[in-house]
Design a protein with these regions (language model features):
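Glycine- and acidic
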Residues: 1, 41-50, 122-127, 331-339, ...
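Conserved oxyanion/phosphate-binding beta-strand-loop segments in alpha/beta enzyme cores
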Residues: 1-39, 69-78, 101-109, 213, ...
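NTP-handling and nucleic-acid-processing catalytic cores
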Residues: 3, 7-15, 138-365, 473-475, ...
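Residue patterns forming the tRNA-binding/recognition surfaces of aminoacyl-tRNA synthetases
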Residues: 4, 13, 17-21, 94-250, ...
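N-terminal catalytic cores of NTP/NDP-binding nucleotidyl/phosphoryl-transfer enzymes
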Residues: 27-99, 103, 127-141, 247-248, ...
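Helix-rich, typically C-terminal accessory recognition domains appended to large enzymatic cores
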Residues: 82, 147-159, 335, 420-449, ...
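Conserved phosphate/anionic-ligand binding catalytic regions in large, soluble enzymes, centered on
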Residues: 243-265, 429, 435-437, 441, ...
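Alpha-helical recognition segments enriched in aromatics with Gly/Pro capping
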Residues: 311-317, 321-334, 363, 480, ...
Length: 809
């Protein structure tokens, strides 16, 4: 397109300038200025490159970085790549080529696209999680987690995906299928590396109160952690054996009419030689093992089960025998693997009892005794805090629920069969994958079965090249590395771990490595960490709420406990950008490639500054919004208009007649405040008001013009630099001082007030703020003179700055 502003010439020119002059290289040792650390969630370098949704969040941090630099901050704004991942591995399996080459090619593509968009990244700080210089320290931190007892190697049920040949974490499973590929996922018992998340639960919950994050994300994490305070009670089994349950509703214990055990738990295994229906029970267990946790709980529409015929538990409060069942909705890996069932006060139990013909015992009612539990349960949301009382509960009859909770707990504790306890919903973080393209676990399985981690001097343990990158028969691909797998060195003999770490390993601490990426003595210098942490602004998608955003907090908490992180929380402020949808409102991405808008196409036709301006003007940053090609054209027209005016020498004056004073100061104020609030769309709207005003005036004082260009350059850096140079400056605009405003000059001189007759608005009147009362009333009466004809004025009322009210008869 032929335009006044030639982006094809201007944008490459300034990108070359920034690179050659290292304009955005941060001296991390410069402690003379306040610091500002802006960070984007780093991307996985896929083969398809960026789509138009990617630049939105990146532009937001770029604007903030540029403004803070002008405000005198030492800014760190790095970029890197979360470069371990399944697509590269699938490429290796398909082609036989090492995934490193595929990954490096993709990184180059991504970096080229990001540079074309004009972001002020310090590329000298770039990291990639698949770089051995980086994952040496991922391995080192994992070793420290193991030495501290937080990383463990245990038997546990895992989410197994046969098609991918690997274990998946809970957040990688969606609706019973793998997040990537949509393949079936089943439960399987395996030895697994796990990290004990529960050890950090209280610190994670407390920390949420100290950080500026979206409340919705904090609530998601609270629910995922799932803290509940209750009582753990021991139940003996008739004929020998016992198990425990955890309950937050101890007040209902007299209403137990059955109990349910996890089909795949150890309790049931110990009863198989005593049940009267072993074939039926085993068949149910086998079916359960085909399901994942979501199938068994969240997605389970009807609660299935199978009786353990002939097996009964004894209720410790009254000695009554209750039948035992197995049900797939009870998970061996959560809580104790057993639950008590009170059909009258839990709707799930009520439905289960209906299906299996089990009795109902009501133990809570209102003070009138009018609660009916024959059609549905009377649950805790209905009775807690409502003055309800116990019934059918022996000596606790007539007590309020709240008093009975304490009294029943005391009785059971005194009997030695119960203890107060805190439970958490989230479980161990599975920290191993049967894949090749991930960090090797730096340990050896010795011949006696024990585990020994390698000395720090042997880190990093580097991935070997393979002829076959596919695992076979459920084994990890590294099983194919026969020579590498067998270890015999310095008196230590054994086999290496052949599972690798998950993709979430490197991303759990990468924000620290940016600060000191070339350090080969420690993961980052402690003095630098103390100065730069925490991250001041972190921008990324909400889909990472219980994955990366939780894992990062866990790793940071661990490092903090060891004196290796200076802060309790890694990310001070978190913002989720909304999705940019296709023109038809469908999400851009690999599922619908036909709706993807390629940013390179927009940059080619309209320029990077147009793309940046358009995406920031689409609407609030946090809101999802559809792409609109017509509005892209509108953004470009605005830039042409700006360029045309401010590069015309005759339009820029060294004198100031005061006509633009108010709109200028209002613009500086609003843009400054809106940038701080990340309200870029309204900041741009104010810039447009200013541009309209200067066009109307026909000229602009040099001070106002230059300061406007500074502000615009944060959003549109190429055109900003170009106009700055045309106005006679040799150096980059990036380090110029941010403009200031005079509050007194932002105030409107006039206000609009209502003119009323007998309290009803008849007109509006523009008046000066300092106009005297008599003058305002006179103007108001003059404005509505035709409506006052023939009326007798009884009273004239003036509320300063608001209304004139003429009372008539």
């Amino acid at each position: 397109m032929s335009e006044v502003y030639n982006h094809h010439a201007v944008e490459p020119k300034w990108q070359k300038y920034w690179e050659e002059h290292e304009t955005f290289k941060t001296d991390v040792w410069d402690f003379s200025k306040p610091k500002y650390y802006a960070l984007d969630m780093f991307p996985y370098p896929s083969g398809v490159g960026l789509h138009a949704g990617h630049p939105e969040g990146y532009t937001a941090t770029d604007i903030m970085s540029r403004m803070k630099r002008m405000q005198g901050y030492n800014v760190l704004h790095p970029m890197g790549y979360d470069s371990f991942g399944l697509p590269a591995e699938q490429y290796a399996v398909t082609t036989g080529n090492h995934p490193a080459g595929f990954t490096e090619k993709n990184i180059q593509t991504f970096s080229k696209q990001l540079k074309e968009l004009g972001f002020d990244y310090d590329w000298s700080k770039m990291i990639a999680t698949s770089d051995p210089k980086f994952y040496k320290w991922t391995q080192w931190i994992f070793k420290k987690l193991y030495e501290a007892g937080y990383a463990k190697h245990i038997d546990m049920p895992v989410n197994w995906c046969e098609e991918l040949g690997t274990v998946l974490s809970n957040d990688e499973v969606i609706d019973g299928k793998s997040e990537r590929g949509g393949y079936p996922v089943v439960k399987k018992m395996m030895k697994q590396w796990v990290i004990d998340q529960q050890a950090f639960a209280e610190e994670l919950l407390d920390g949420l109160n100290e950080i500026d994050w979206p409340e919705s994300t904090k609530e998601i994490q609270r629910n995922w952690i799932g803290k509940s305070t209750g009582v753990e009670v021991d139940f003996k089994i008739v004929g020998g054996g016992e198990f425990s349950i955890f309950t937050t509703c101890i007040e209902t214990i007299y209403g137990i009419t059955f109990m349910v055990l996890a089909p795949d738990g150890d309790i049931v295994k110990g009863l198989m030689d005593r049940v009267e229906n072993p074939e039926e029970v085993q068949a149910y267990i086998d079916e359960t093992l085909k399901k994942n946790d979501l199938d068994r709980t969240d997605l389970n529409k009807t609660k299935s089960g199978c009786p353990l015929k002939g097996i009964y538990a004894i209720n410790p409060v009254n000695g009554k025998e209750v039948p035992l069942f197995i049900g797939d909705f009870v998970l061996a890996s959560y809580g104790t693997g057993a639950v008590m069932a009170v059909p009258t006060h839990d709707q799930r139990d009520f439905e289960y009892a209906e299906v299996h013909g089990l009795p109902l015992i009501q133990v809570i009612t209102n003070t009138e005794g009018t609660v009916d539990v024959t059609k549905h349960a009377f649950e805790k949301t209905e009775y807690l805090g409502k003055g309800c009382i116990l019934m059918n509960s022996e000596e606790f009859n007539g007590m309020t629920v709240e008093d009975a909770k304490k009294a029943i707990t005391k009785k059971l504790v005194d009997m030695g069969v119960a203890r107060e306890k805190v439970n958490y919903h989230f479980r161990e973080w599975i920290f191993a994958r049967q894949r090749y393209w991930g960090e090797p676990v730096p340990c050896i399985y010795k011949e006696d079965g024990s585990i020994q981690f390698l000395d720090d001097s042997e880190l990093p343990v580097v991935l070997p090249e393979l002829e076959d990158y596919k695992g076979h028969g459920g084994q990890a691909p590294l099983e194919n590395a026969t020579e590498w797998k067998h270890y015999d060195k310095n008196g230590l003999k054994g086999t290496r771990e052949t599972s690798t770490m998950p993709g979430s390993a490197g991303s759990s601490w990468y924000y620290m490595r940016y600060i000191d990426p070339d350090n080969d003595k420690e993961f980052a210098n402690q003095e630098l960490l103390k100065h730069w942490m925490p991250v001041d602004l972190y921008v990324g998608g909400p889909e990472h709420a219980v994955g990366h955003l939780l894992y990062s907090r866990i790793w940071n908490r661990f490092l903090y406990s060891k004196g290796l992180s200076p802060v309790e929380e890694p990310f001070k402020k978190l913002v989720h950008q909304g999705m940019i949808l296709g023109e038809n409102g469908i999400k851009m991405g690999k599922r619908f490639p036909e709706f993807v808008v390629n940013p390179s196409d927009i940059v080619e036709e309209y320029g990077a500054d147009t793309l940046r301006l358009y995406e920031m003007f689409m609407g609030p940053l946090e809101v999802s919004k559809p792409w609109n090609s017509n509005n892209v054209t509108g953004a470009r027209k605005f830039l042409n208009r700006v360029y045309s005016f401010f590069t015309e020498e005759s339009n820029i004056t060294d004198e100031n007649n005061g006509n633009l004073e108010k709109v200028y100061h209002q613009t500086v104020k609003k843009v400054t405040n809106d940038f701080e609030a990340l309200a870029f769309n309204t900041a741009i709207a104010q810039m447009m008001i200013f541009v309209n005003a200067v066009y109307k005036e026909g000229s602009c004082p040099r001070e106002y013009a230059e300061n406007f260009i500074k502000m615009l350059s944060c959003i549109c850096p190429h055109i900003g630099e170009e106009m700055w140079q045309i106005l006679g400056h040799d150096d980059t605009i990036a380090y110029e001082a941010w403009p200031t405003y005079d509050e007194a000059k932002c105030v409107e001189d006039t206000v609009e007030i209502a003119v009323q007759i007998n309290g009803k608005v008849k007109a509006t009147l523009a008046i000066g703020k300092e106009d005297p009362k008599d003058e305002v009333i006179a103007k108001g009466k003059e404005l509505i003179a035709d409506k006052l004809e023939g009326k007798n004025i009884v009273k004239e009322i003036y509320v300063p700055g608001r209304i004139v009210n003429i009372v008539v008869k």
